[in-house]
């Protein structure tokens, strides 16, 4: 596990509340729309990569999804998510892992990531991610990144920007682009 990145994210989640970080969404509308656009049932296996303290899991539970996994490099982020969910947290599989070191024990019908991929700035990291996704994402993969017009940093870390075309080309060998959407991150 990349100790520098892990320490960074542990500090963020130890010192910041959800309203103090730019990525917090009260309602993860776009993610929910994407997930609902796929022909799946409520027993579909869904993994939220970098989901930490995201409320996506809350909405998925409320909508009856039964097989949800949340993966994050930050144990503190996952603790916050568990605390927010209370007793419902036991319905979720929680995994503390750097995505580039993740060793999935199952496959997923939906691989959702609006928080991690853009932080992979080196080709080796991207290749590791692709190898893991190739094995574990057997249904649909939905990725959110910063566009070429977006920020060059997030939470003080460098990110990699993508156009719809460049992001599609990264995944083209293993995944077909079904749709793309632009959304402004303010």
PLM regions and their residue ranges:
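A conserved beta-strand element that flanks and buttresses the S-adenosyl-L-methionine
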Residues: 112
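Class I (Rossmann-like) S-adenosyl-L-methionine-dependent methyltransferase catalytic domain
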Residues: 1-106, 120-186
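Short catalytic micro-motifs in class I SAM-dependent methyltransferases
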Residues: 115-119
């Amino acid at each position: 596990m990349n100790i520098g990145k892990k320490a960074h994210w542990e500090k963020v989640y130890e010192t910041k509340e959800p309203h103090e970080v730019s990525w917090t969404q009260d309602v993860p509308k776009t993610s929910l729309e994407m997930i609902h656009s796929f022909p799946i049932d409520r027993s579909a296996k869904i993994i939220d990569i970098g989901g930490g303290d995201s409320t996506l899991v809350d909405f998925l539970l409320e909508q009856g999804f039964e097989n949800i996994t949340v993966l994050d490099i930050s144990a503190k982020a996952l603790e916050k998510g568990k605390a927010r969910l209370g007793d419902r947290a036991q319905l979720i599989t929680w995994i503390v892992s750097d995505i580039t070191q993740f060793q999935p024990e199952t496959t997923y019908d939906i691989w959702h990531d609006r928080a991690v991929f853009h932080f992979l700035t080196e080709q080796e990291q991207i290749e590791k991610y692709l190898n893991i996704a190739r094995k574990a994402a057997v249904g649909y993969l939905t990725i959110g990144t910063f566009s070429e017009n977006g920020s060059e940093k997030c939470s003080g870390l460098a990110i990699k920007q993508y156009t719809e075309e460049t992001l599609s080309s990264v995944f083209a060998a293993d995944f077909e682009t079904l749709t793309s959407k632009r959304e402004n991150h303010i």
